[in-house]
């Protein structure tokens, strides 16, 4: 699947170079310097709306972060058989973080371990048309990323994949 190839590329690039990855459909509400500014954090990402996966449209990391080796290897092993679950890699990422931190579920905030300090934001989606100034997305949702209850990022433009764009 194309999305899974993009996941693999994203993981490889972030492992090698580090940096901040934002999906093209991401709109920052807060300044980027106020979002990724926590001390001693080497991985930022987002708990998806279902609370069972990682929203991979936002990932920030230091170069050579060892969690990405595990994520890359998981993709390479998994693609040897047909993949029926579109969210297989986002769920694996979530479960890997749970395993590292010895948690039953992940929550918004800072998590510290011997080799990995992570900060997690929350994705929250509603079906309320008034929550998004540009309307609901193609799935009928309005989704934002929150940090401790504060909206910091809007995700999923209502018109993505930009209907009406010339081909």
Q: Could you describe each region identified by the protein language model?
A:
Residues 7-19:
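Small-residue hinge/turn detector
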Residues 1-6, 22-167:
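Glycosyltransferase-associated regions of secretory-pathway enzymes
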């Amino acid at each position: 699947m194309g999305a899974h190839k993009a996941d693999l590329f994203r993981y490889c690039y972030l492992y090698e170079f580090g940096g901040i990855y934002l999906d093209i459909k991401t709109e920052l509400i807060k300044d980027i310097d106020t979002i990724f500014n926590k001390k001693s954090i080497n991985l930022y990402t987002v708990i998806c709306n279902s609370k069972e996966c990682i929203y991979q449209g936002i990932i920030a990391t230091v170069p050579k972060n060892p969690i990405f080796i595990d994520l890359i290897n998981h993709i390479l092993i998994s693609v040897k058989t047909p993949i029926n679950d579109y969210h297989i890699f986002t769920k694996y990422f979530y479960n890997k973080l749970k395993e590292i931190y010895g948690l039953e579920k992940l929550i918004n905030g800072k998590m510290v371990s011997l080799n990995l300090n992570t900060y997690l934001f929350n994705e929250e989606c509603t079906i309320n048309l008034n929550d998004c100034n540009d309307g609901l997305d193609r799935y009928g949702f309005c989704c934002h990323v929150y940090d401790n209850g504060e909206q910091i990022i809007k995700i999923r433009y209502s018109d993505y994949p930009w209907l009406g764009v010339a081909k």
